[in-house]
Design a protein with these regions (language model features):
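Conserved serine/cysteine hydrolase catalytic core
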Residues: 172-212
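Active-site loop/oxyanion-hole signature of alpha/beta-hydrolase fold enzymes
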Residues: 37-84, 239
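Conserved HGGG/HGGXW glycine-rich cap/lid loop of the alpha/beta-hydrolase fold
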Residues: 3-50
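Catalytic active-site module of serine/aspartate enzymes centered on a nucleophile-bearing elbow/loop
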Residues: 217-273
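Flexible "cap/lid" loop of the alpha/beta hydrolase fold
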Residues: 94-99, 105-134
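Gly/Ala-rich beta-loop-alpha elbow adjacent to hydrolase catalytic centers
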Residues: 85, 89, 93
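Conserved alpha/beta-hydrolase catalytic His-Asp/Glu region
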Residues: 127-188
Length: 273
């Protein structure tokens, strides 16, 4: 009889302006080796979020980290968990990891916010000016990712008053939040991946230096990439993440090594993807 080998759980946590669909190009590849879970922490028109809002609750990073913990305890129950997060989702993961170190395996952070400096949040302009093309386009290095279908999808969402209220409440509770004071407290092996041309983060070099305070961090910078590496460079990201979580990423290719990138003052270095 063939012995069944349980796949380790990997939890995907998306960012502020993203939904679970943002992982569509990654999940099939990672599912070959891992049990992928995607908690819906930010369903902006969902009853759970609005019940919390109507009771006077704030939609904050600690609140989202608490919701993540409830999801894991009730529906996964197989620690330790590996985590892959994007943007704001990285703050949620680190908040959970510092509070529950024994339940966390490895961590991968994609374009994490809240490490250093300000953020240029296109979602605010999308809400205030109904400029959905700007909202979507500013996230990516190459504008063809901001196609008409994606722009139309956001336009439809923002016309839903309940969805828009959920976004606004989340913005008020999370904009400007920092996890800089947590970085030195993270004991886990962590891979941090940045887009060299990220226009959402105001200071990528400063953020890289801040991430160096994590005692077990390895860092990568991807040229010609914006704030959504998992979408823009999905093939490269899929390989890096899969190898890292399986202890097979022995070396960082020099073309994407963060230390080398900093020495070149952020100059783009060609990389085969």
């Amino acid at each position: 009889m063939t012995k069944f080998k349980r796949r380790p759980p990997v939890i995907l946590v998306n960012g502020l302006a993203e939904q679970s669909e943002s992982w569509n190009t990654n999940r099939p590849d990672w599912s070959k080796h891992f049990d992928i879970k995607v908690p819906e922490l930010l369903v902006y028109n969902g009853d759970a979020l609005h019940k919390h809002i109507e009771s006077g609750g704030e939609v904050s990073i600690p609140y989202l980290a608490e919701r993540l913990g409830v999801f894991l305890d009730e529906f996964v129950q197989k620690p330790p968990y590996h985590f892959v997060g994007s943007s704001l989702g990285c703050q949620v993961i680190l908040t959970y990891a510092v509070a529950n170190p024994e339940k966390v395996g490895k961590i991968v952070l994609l374009a994490p916010s809240g490490f250093h400096g300000d953020e240029n949040l296109p979602v605010i302009e999308g809400v205030s000016r109904a400029n959905y093309g700007t909202l979507v386009g500013s996230v990516f290095y190459k504008k063809y990712f901001a196609n008409d279908d994606l722009i139309a999808a956001y336009e439809k969402k923002f016309k839903d008053r309940k969805w828009k209220k959920g976004v606004l409440k989340t913005l008020r509770g999370t904009v400007g939040h920092s996890v800089a004071d947590l970085l030195e407290q993270v004991p886990h092996q962590t891979l941090v991946i940045w887009g060299a041309d990220d226009k959402v983060l105001s200071d990528v070099p400063g953020s890289i230096r801040a991430a160096d305070r994590m005692i077990r961090a390895r860092q990568v910078v991807i040229p010609k990439c914006g704030h959504a590496p998992q979408i823009e460079k999905s093939r490269l990201i899929n390989g890096l993440v899969s190898k890292y979580l399986r202890d097979k990423l022995t070396t960082i290719p020099p073309q994407i090594d963060a230390t080398r990138w900093l020495k070149h003052a952020g100059a783009n270095v060609p990389v085969k993807v």
